[in-house]
Amino acid sequence: MTPDAARPLTGVRIVEISSFVAVPLAGMTLAQLGAEVIRVDPIGGAADYHRWPLTDSGESIYWAGLNKGKRSVAADMRSPDGQDLVQRLIADSGVLITNVAGRQWHSYEALTRLRPDLIHVEISGRADGGTGVDYTVNAGVGFPMVTGPAELAAPVNHVLPAWDVACGVYAALAVVTALRHRDATGHGQQIGIPLENVALATAGNLSFLTEAMVNGNARERIGNSVYGQYGQDFTSSDGASFMVVALTGRHFRDLTELTGTTKAVAALADTLGADFADEGERYRHREALTGVFTEWFSAHTGEEIAAALKETSVLWDRYQSFAEVVTDERVTANPMFTALSQPRIGEYLAPGLPMSIDGSYPPATPAPALGDDTAAVLCDWLGLTPEEISALTESGTVA
């Protein structure tokens, strides 16, 4: 495999004007695929430049995590000169990804006057043009009402910014498909991705919305159970927690044999008039089944449970904290992770692209500091002389 085979977007140039999660993730994904991605920020940094978590010296671990492999330009995007300069960078690249909506100077209409075949991908909060972030979009699409303990009445937010992550992947996909379209037709595209629509589409595609429309009822809150299947968390005698899932008949039979409950489960089925070969029946009577299985889990240590589960087809894993995960072989021996020396942050294992291409994982490379590449990009992309760049720096147009 040639080096370019693992970086299929080599030669593509992209300008990113962004903050927070979705667009930075899209830009980083495209960079990991080989594109030259220039993140353009205001002088002093966008709203996410100092976002937590921070190092003891105040550097943003978060910012470094979502901007690996990019180049950084800092410009005064409120000034006409700064806007003109960034417009020229966008026109040169032919691709803009942004979640900074409502800025006329980098709108599709304004930029296509400079680059008619421009690919313009803009993430917004809501389809009606309103503002929204992952945490507020999530509140309005139903998921907090089915998250958390079954007995709880109040909404529960999930910690993972799921809609931002999904939206970022959609944005990267949009760029790749638009590049394909431009190669085939010579035309660019204007692509809008409302964050709210990503959440609503997911809720619909996974049947949460459709169930309410067709059956007339909302999904119930079931805690750590798995809807429509048998899946439950269990705790060992020494306090270790496990998630155990039996999706198939074989999984379920192995679980009953492992726990020595085959006869007890058969007796329960007779009492309830249930057929546990049916996944719906296993789900419907999940609480009774959990009561049968709990005795075995609570009588064994975490190590004993893990060793026993490894010998079966049952799907499972042990709950771990992030501090435990980083010492696990799934990180330390995973070829997706690269030992990265990140300036101002330190050395750590950083994930690259989470997919192998012809057996190779594109490795992680460091994130730039704000404005690290301003002069080089202005020279390489726009052909500005050192004197011209110096004048722009002295005037406060770039940094």
Task: State each model region's role.
Residues 161-176, 195-205, 247-251:
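Mid-domain beta-loop-alpha active-site segment that forms a flexible
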Residues 152-160, 183-199, 221-224, 274-275:
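Conserved Rossmann-fold dehydrogenase catalytic segment
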Residues 1-13, 235-237, 324-399:
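Terminal low-complexity tails and localization/encapsulation signals of metabolic enzymes
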Residues 168-188, 205-212, 256-268:
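Oxidoreductase and adenylate-handling cofactor-binding alpha/beta cores
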Residues 1-184, 369, 375-399:
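N-terminal helix-loop segment corresponding to the beta1-alpha1 unit
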